Amino acid sequence: MNLRRCVQALLLLWLCLSAVCGGPLLQTSDGKEMEEGTIRYLVQPRGPRSGPGPWQGGRRKFRRQRPRLSHKGPMPF
């Protein structure tokens, strides 16, 4: 039981010291402070889909639909 309390006390002391000193979580890769560090985005935000694309004026409004299988006539077998 004494060993358990000793381990808990050491863990609590380590957590308090790492919270006070900052630890490696508050450092940036370039060595600057958090306010001066560069912000890197992993995912690029997408633009609006209604903007101009490969065709002038955005999407093609009247696109011919694909015919269904029933429109192709009888099956050959």
UniProtKB/Swiss-Prot annotation:
Residue positions assigned to the propeptide: 23-41
Pfam families (alphabetical): Apelin (PF15360)
One example of a Gene Ontology biological process annotation: gastrulation
Positions of region (Disordered): 43-77
GO cellular component: extracellular region; extracellular space
Signal peptide bounds: 1-22
Residues with the Pyrrolidone carboxylic acid modification: 65
Keywords, alphabetical: Angiogenesis, Cleavage on pair of basic residues, Developmental protein, Gastrulation, Hormone, Pyrrolidone carboxylic acid, Secreted, Signal
Record keyword Ligase present: no
Source domain of life: Eukaryota
Biological function: Peptide hormone that functions as endogenous ligand for the G-protein-coupled apelin receptor (APLNR/APJ), that plays a role in cadiovascular homeostasis. Functions as a balanced agonist activating both G(i) protein pathway and beta-arrestin pathway of APLNR. Downstream G proteins activation, apelin can inhibit cAMP production and activate key intracellular effectors such as ERKs. On the other hand, APLNR activation induces beta-arrestin recruitment to the membrane leading to desensitization and internalization of the receptor.
Protein name listed in UniProt: Apelin
Source organism of this protein record: Bos taurus
